[in-house]
Amino acid sequence: MHEMSITQSVVEICEKSAGGRRVLAVTLEIGDLSGVVPDAIEFCFEACTRDTLLEGARLVIERVPGRGECTSCGKEFPVRGYFDPCPACGAYGMRVVSGEELRVKELEVE
């Protein structure tokens, strides 16, 4: 489960950013195409925050839907995977516009 190491990295990033202050809430953006399972992050969060500045912090996860832009016709459309065809022209080449995000969006500290 790579979500455990991802959650540990999130905790480290938040602790550095908090500057020694207790963290009350963390907001993460997780894209639907990122390969990260939000439920698994939630499951790991309590264990990873034990005895840290984040212990007891609230975790908020904002999902970012996948969107692509067709490289043939330029149409932007929702995607669930990297090989979805363009709904306008049927071509398979696309550029991902959103959905690969995995970032700490907001940190609430004391």
Swiss-Prot record:
Gene: hypA
Keyword terms, alphabetized: Metal-binding, Nickel, Zinc
Residues the entry annotates as binding Zn(2+): C70, C73, C86, C89
BP GO terms, sorted: protein maturation; protein modification process
Binding residues annotated for Ni(2+), in chain numbering: H2
Annotated function: Involved in the maturation of [NiFe] hydrogenases. Required for nickel insertion into the metal center of the hydrogenase.
UniProt xrefs under InterPro entries: Hydgase_Ni_incorp_HypA/HybF_CS (IPR020538), HypA/HybF (IPR000688)
Family recorded in the similarity comment: Belongs to the HypA/HybF family.
Protein name (database record): Hydrogenase maturation factor HypA
Single annotated GO MF: nickel cation binding
